[in-house]
């Protein structure tokens, strides 16, 4: 059975790949039928849809970083693991604008064909302080 520490390692691999603009590695971690809720007002219903969006979004930045804070990782059974965390994103766009976002992430990992894949992902911004 996979341990919560191993699931946390997979989540870290995801964060590192995203922060390094390695879209291929991020997409490689997704199940074909992944569902993703991101910072846009619609849902992605499969890997191909999200890959197209992600490629365009990452391509808008010359540099970026991404990290998880306070990850909570747990196994539901021998085929499902969940990671909840706060996330921090910083990037510089091609026109030199700095973007900093703080949010929440939930990644659900499922065993698919002997491999752990992200089967569901939810990214949402933290409320702005008033």
Describe each PLM feature range:
Residues 1-5, 129-130:
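Basic/polar N-terminal segments that are highly enriched at the extreme N-terminus
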Residues 4-5, 23-79, 100:
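A solvent-exposed, acidic/Ser-Thr-rich amphipathic alpha-helical stretch
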Residues 11, 66-72, 86, 104:
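Short structured motifs
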Residues 14, 21-22:
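Short helix-adjacent coil turns
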Residues 60, 89-99, 127:
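Short, cysteine-centered beta-strand-loop-beta hairpins and adjacent loop/turn segments enriched
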Residues 79-89:
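A short hydrophobic beta-strand element
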Residues 102-129:
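Short beta-strand edge/turn micro-motifs at domain boundaries
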């Amino acid at each position: 059975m996979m341990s919560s520490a191993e699931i946390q390692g997979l989540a870290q691999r995801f964060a590192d790949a995203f922060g390094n603009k390695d879209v291929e590695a991020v997409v490689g971690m997704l199940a074909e039928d992944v569902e993703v809720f991101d910072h846009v007002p619609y849902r992605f219903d499969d890997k191909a849809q999200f890959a197209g969006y992600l490629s365009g979004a990452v391509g808008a930045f010359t540099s970026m970083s991404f990290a998880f804070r306070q990850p909570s990782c747990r196994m539901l059974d021998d085929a499902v693991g969940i990671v909840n965390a706060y996330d921090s994103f910083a990037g510089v766009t091609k026109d030199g604008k700095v973007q900093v976002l703080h949010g929440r992430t939930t990644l659900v990992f499922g065993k698919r064909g002997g491999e752990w894949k992200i089967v569901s992902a939810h990214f949402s911004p933290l409320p702005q302080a008033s």
